[in-house]
Amino acid sequence: MSDDLRVTTAHLRELSAKQGRAAAELATATAVVDGVDTALRFTHGPISWGTAAAVEAVQHARRAAGTGMVKVSQELETKLDTAAGRYHRTDSTMGDALDETIQPR
């Protein structure tokens, strides 16, 4: 196993895109159950209000967790994209510097 660290901007951008897709899917999944408590109250009437209140509490907790995960994925997407840009600029700058030090034949 090699101890060399190899970083490619393409791989960082690929990982960034995956985090962006994950954030979008998490946002969609988080919203899927919105309104279940209201529907329960509407379809089952006052007898279901205790259950509907419990469902509402679970929905709030689920929404908070989902929103937190979306935020983390979005932040990671941004950080990976920023890192890719920095690696690209560093590679380009150092390549130019190296080209300047090599004497033509």
Swiss-Prot record:
Annotated Pfam families:
T7SS_ESX_EspC (PF10824)
Disrupted gene: phenotype observed: Loss of DNA conjugation when disrupted in recipient strain, strain does not secrete EsxB.
Identify its protein family. Belongs to the EspC family.
Q: What functional role does this protein have?
A: May be involved in assembly of the ESX-1 / type VII specialized secretion system (T7SS), which exports several proteins including EsxA and EsxB. Involved in DNA conjugation, in at least recipient strain.
Q: What else is known?
A: DNA conjugation in M.smegmatis is unidirectional with distinct donor and recipient strains; mc(2)155 is a donor strain while MKD8 is a recipient strain. Mutations in a donor strain that alter DNA transfer do not always alter DNA transfer in a recipient strain.
Taxonomic placement: Bacteria, Bacillati, Actinomycetota, Actinomycetes, Mycobacteriales
Under InterPro entries, the record lists: EspC (IPR022536)
The biological process GO terms on file are: protein secretion
Name assigned to this protein: Uncharacterized EspC-like protein D806_0056
